[in-house]
Regions:
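Acidic, low-complexity terminal tails and accessory targeting/binding regions
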Residues: 1-4, 46, 91-110, 168-260
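Short glycine/proline- and acidic residue-enriched helix-loop micro-motifs
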Residues: 112-135
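Active-site-proximal alpha-helix that buttresses catalytic centers in soluble enzyme cores
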Residues: 2-79, 105
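A short, structured active-site edge motif that brings together acidic residues
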Residues: 59, 77-97, 117-121
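Glycine-rich phosphate-binding loop signature in dinucleotide/nucleotide-binding domains
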Residues: 46-50, 150-156
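Generic beta-sheet signal
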Residues: 5, 53, 156-162
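Short beta-strand scaffold positions
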Residues: 57-58, 141, 161-162
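A short, acidic, amphipathic alpha-helical segment used as a generic capping/interface helix at domain edges
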Residues: 139-153
Length: 260
């Protein structure tokens, strides 16, 4: 039987508070640290929180900090932590781009970074084949990659600490307030009817009606909007695919020269 998923959004980070998207891989604010402590209390008091057998975390700074503070009690009792670049945020702005693995290993020596894709945090080269590219095609595929990997896991309950944009557009079509959490199961009936054989989640009635486990998130279904993915990137990817490797390399060089 596939696992139940406890999906968590990271707590408030500097870019959330300042609306400054130029901050590279921002850390949590003081409020974010407090939200993480509240997450700790909320999950520890819940039945599902005490059933978690695996923790999957995006290797970005804000998600690692949220897990370190909010899920510390799970970690201290021996729950395995697995870092996975597939759960990183969508965009290629500095705030949504991670640091080199060597940098993060020095900051978070308690975690094993050997499971992180060596190409992380690159999102801008070879757009047509880069699994982390900021394109609708790549992000939706990445969401399915994440769900397939968890569907096949032996654990009964898995917690994931990720990002609002990725969770909403590619995983579960829900909004998450900072440090809030929701519970999902795999919707086997919907999956069986899916012509594309997609992995589809169904939210628990409790967190759906409440607006997250802490009741801080918007209620409802929220899909992809026209502003989620830049049209110029989508057009550029099509251009790469149409004109072949030589054109792709040329476009990569142009990307590197663009201001961020």
């Amino acid at each position: 039987m596939p696992p139940t998923l406890l999906l968590v959004r990271h707590a408030q980070a500097l870019h959330n508070a300042t609306q400054d998207w130029s901050i590279h891989d921002p850390k949590l604010t003081e409020l974010g640290e407090q939200q993480s402590r509240e997450l700790h209390e909320s999950l520890k008091a819940s039945k599902i929180g005490n059933e978690v057998e695996l923790i999957v975390v995006s290797p970005m700074r804000r998600t690692l900090q949220t897990a370190t503070i909010g899920l510390d009690w799970m970690i201290k009792k021996g729950t395995k932590v697995m870092l996975d670049a597939n759960w990183q945020e969508n965009a290629d702005k500095p705030c949504d781009t991670g640091n080199k693995i060597s940098v993060m290993e020095a900051e978070f020596p308690q975690y094993d970074f050997s499971t992180v894709d060596p190409s992380y945090p690159d999102k801008t080269t070879n757009l047509s084949s880069n699994p982390y590219a900021f394109t609708e095609k790549a992000i939706l595929a990445r969401g399915q990659t994440c769900l397939k990997a968890l569907y096949d896991r032996p654990e009964k309950v898995i917690a994931v600490v990720s990002h609002s944009g990725f969770l909403r557009t590619a995983v579960c079509n829900r909004m998450f307030f900072n440090a809030d959490w929701r519970v999902f199961t795999f919707d086997e009936d919907a999956m069986a009817k899916s012509a594309e054989k997609k992995f589809i989640l169904k939210e628990s009635e409790e967190t759906e009606k409440k607006g997250g486990g802490m009741g801080r998130s918007d209620v409802g279904v929220f899909g992809i909007t026209e502003n989620d993915f830049p049209p110029e990137v989508q057009d550029q990817m099509k251009d790469e695919e149409a004109k072949g490797p030589a054109k792709a390399e040329e476009l990569d060089e142009v990307n590197k020269q663009k201001p961020t």
